[in-house]
UniProtKB/Swiss-Prot annotation:
Keyword Nucleotide-binding: yes
Keyword Signal: no
Naturally occurring in which organism (per UniProt): Bacillus subtilis (strain 168)
Top-level taxonomic group: Bacteria
Residues annotated as binding ATP: A82, D83, E84, V85, G86, L87, G88, K89, T90
Keywords assigned by UniProt, alphabetized: ATP-binding, Helicase, Hydrolase, Nucleotide-binding
An example molecular function term from Gene Ontology annotations: DNA binding
UniProt-recorded name of the protein: Uncharacterized ATP-dependent helicase YqhH
Positions occupied by motif DEAH box: 175-178
EC number: 3.6.4.-
């Protein structure tokens, strides 16, 4: 039905006359019109969502609508949104925010996200939800604007901190909330001290290593919901119990946490194809690796052992990464004794100078040329990132770097370049956090993280809603090195690369390997021979395989 709008040109004159004469103000026709407007705007009942009616250019998915409705109706606006990577937690948070705004329950909003995601959040809220979100930049907008998106690092820094903590917020949203898992950090303390009526914590990995992490997150939403910290430690943490093994704990957590898994959504997900690319060291690279490995025989200090392990991993990445670590040790020798003595460092630097090629980088160039499409490369080390950009350029391949130290504007620029003519984006762990790159479907794990949850976060950058092609993951692993041992454990033995976060929960979180990385470090530190290391790795693999097959109630025993 089309309603014809007729403008009354006499209205301004009549209004001015009424102001002059102080009346008459009563008008039955205008009153009826006003009443009709109020009736239209009125929300008939609290059940059901109104927000979708106000989204003309965007249709949320069913699981996203269910999450928003549950948070609003049953959780009183305090929830951990823990959907697997790529299911649209930002959309769910946007729906909840829109719903509270429509109902008049939220006006003053604070959204804290990693610096690299600030612009992405503002754009999504404005375009999908028609929410006038404002980005906190150089000028202070905390008090002037109602809906502010900022990095948590900016918000917690003086003089911003004092202003933000003085404002009573109706709703606070925290993205990548797993960074708040440690209650002793400044970030945790800052979020805890925020004055807030409603709060949403977004994370695909609510538990990464220890069950205490979920206690800290829940305590931000509802202090005391899981009891006191001492009680929780005695009842669950010290017994090394899993979330699944304790029905009571699971029920309590589920009252504040929603976790959708890919198979729950009913959506047709693109396939994930995983390929291992074996790398053979050149003789000079092998000599450097062996020189580093031999240091284990003469050093027993834990700190020094950790340094050796780091150097081994860096050697599998690039000679540049090894050199930068050794240089840092020498630069800091005035403040503290280096983990490795100066003479040994000099020997290692001589070995570095004898390395004339990077076998892994050569393999990457061949792979990228074979793919002939956009590729994202993940590396653990900034020195390797810089080297790779130079090396790819020497081989006629265009690339851009992406790392945590970049300012927000530069990160957006790098993403735009990659979306355009640039073929390769080289990201570090911090740089790749939270970015959405569905237009790319090839990923090279140049270096492998030892925490499978971090690996899934990487893959989730491209294997997510909106991906229209099958995803291809290439894992680089140098033969006969610590890198190969880790890859065999994670991939060939327990097939973690084919899993997604929910399945990783079943294998890692629920089976009581409370800190996966610590277990790996312990094996590699204290293995006297290659054979001993293989035996320990096989034992860990058998333990994982056995535990994941047990019913939930028996996994904690």
């Amino acid at each position: 039905m089309n309603t014809e709008m007729i403008y009354d040109a006499k209205w301004p004159e009549e209004f001015a006359e009424r102001l002059k004469n102080d009346g008459p103000w009563a008008n039955w026709e205008l009153y009826k019109l006003s009443a009709e407007i109020q009736k239209t705007l009125a929300i008939p009942e609290f059940e059901g969502l109104r927000a979708p009616l106000y989204l003309p250019s965007f249709t949320p998915l069913p699981h996203q609508l269910e999450v928003a409705q549950k948070v609003v109706e049953k959780m009183n606006g305090k929830a951990i949104l823990a959907d697997e990577v790529g299911l649209g937690k930002t959309v769910e948070a946007g729906l909840i925010l829109k719903e509270y705004m429509i109902r008049g329950l939220a006006k003053k909003i604070l959204i804290l996200v990693p610096a690299s995601l600030v612009s992405q959040w503002v754009k999504e809220l404005q375009e999908k939800f028609l929410i006038p979100a404002v980005e906190q930049k150089k000028s202070y907008v905390w008090e002037q604007c109602d809906i502010v998106v900022s990095s948590i690092d900016t918000a917690k820094r003086s003089p911003h901190r004092e202003i933000v903590l003085s404002i009573p917020y109706d709703l606070v949203i925290i993205d990548e909330a797993h960074k708040l898992k440690n209650s002793k950090t400044k970030n945790y303390e800052f979020v805890r001290n925020l004055v807030k009526k409603y709060c949403l914590l977004l994370t695909a990995t609510p538990i990464q290593n220890r069950i205490e992490e979920i206690f800290n997150l829940v305590s931000l939403l509802k202090p005391g919901h899981l009891g006191s910290q001492n009680h929780f430690q005695e009842e669950f943490a010290k017994k090394k119990s899993s979330l699944e093994a304790h029905e009571h704990l699971k029920d309590l957590v589920n009252k504040v946490m929603i976790r959708n898994r890919r198979h729950d959504t009913g959506l047709n997900w693109k396939q994930r194809h995983v390929e291992t690319v074996p790398i053979q060291f050149s003789p000079s690279e092998q000599a450097l690796y062996d020189e580093i490995s031999r240091l284990k025989d003469s050093i027993n200090k834990p700190a020094s052992m950790f340094s050796i392990m780091t150097l081994q991993r860096e050697c599998c990445s690039s000679r540049e990464a090894v050199y930068m670590t050794l240089k840092k040790m020498l630069d800091q020798k005035e403040k503290q004794a280096p983990a490795i003595d100066e003479d040994t460092i000099s020997v290692l630097i001589d070995r570095i100078n004898q390395v004339t090629q990077n076998s892994k980088a050569l393999q990457v160039v061949d792979l990228i040329k074979k793919i002939d499409d956009k590729v994202i490369i993940f590396t653990e080390y900034r020195a390797t990132q810089i080297y790779l950009q130079w090396f790819l350029q020497q081989n006629g391949i265009s690339s851009v770097p992406f790392r945590g130290g970049f300012k927000r504007g530069k990160k957006d620029w790098m993403k735009d370049l990659f979306r355009g003519k640039i073929q390769v984006l080289i990201a570090t762990e911090a740089g790749g956090e939270g970015i959405n790159l569905q237009f790319c479907n090839h990923m090279i794990n140049y270096d492998l993280p030892w925490n499978p949850m971090r690996l899934e976060q990487r893959i989730g950058r491209i294997h997510r809603l909106g991906q229209e092609r099958d995803v291809h993951i290439y894992n680089m692993a140098t033969k006969h090195t610590v890198e190969e041992h880790i890859l065999k454990l994670l991939y060939e033995k327990i097939h973690l690369f084919e899993k997604v976060v929910g399945e990783l929960d079943d294998i890692l979180t629920k089976i009581q390997v409370n800190n996966f990385e610590e277990h790996l470090h312990d094996i590699l530190y204290h293995s006297a021979t290659e054979e001993e290391m293989k035996i320990k790795m096989d034992n860990l693999t058998s333990f994982l395989s056995y535990k994941k097959q047990l019913p939930a109630e028996k996994r904690g025993s």
